[in-house]
Amino acid sequence: MGKRFLKKIIAQSPQDLKFISACCSEAKVKNSDIKYLPLNKIFLLSISRFNKESDNNERINSIIRFEFIQSSKSKNIDQNNFDLILELLAINLFKRKNNFEITLLFSKNKIITLNAEVIEVTLEDQKIINDKKF
């Protein structure tokens, strides 16, 4: 049995963010595990994702940390339903005049849009889950 390592991936360019998006597609996110800290300009997601980088297809608890976030908006997400499970499909990036718009696309047309000063996103694995259920 080989050693298993937890990863930390930092994105500072559009190409880097595409890699994080690919790693996190089909990740499960509980609505109560989404946090925006406006004073710190940080947006956090605690996700359960498949380890697509290995062949064993295990689940990993990870944190996606978006920094330098000026604002956050959501569409079609009930903020009062803390038990709602979202499935992250992709993370998209759009350049605006003086900033970036990061869009988190979830299944069933649910969207979170982040307005960022720069691209500074970290995907950090926390724990490998033995049980394949979310």
Named regions from a protein language model:
Residues 1-134:
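Surface-exposed, interaction-prone regions used to assemble/regulate multi-protein complexes
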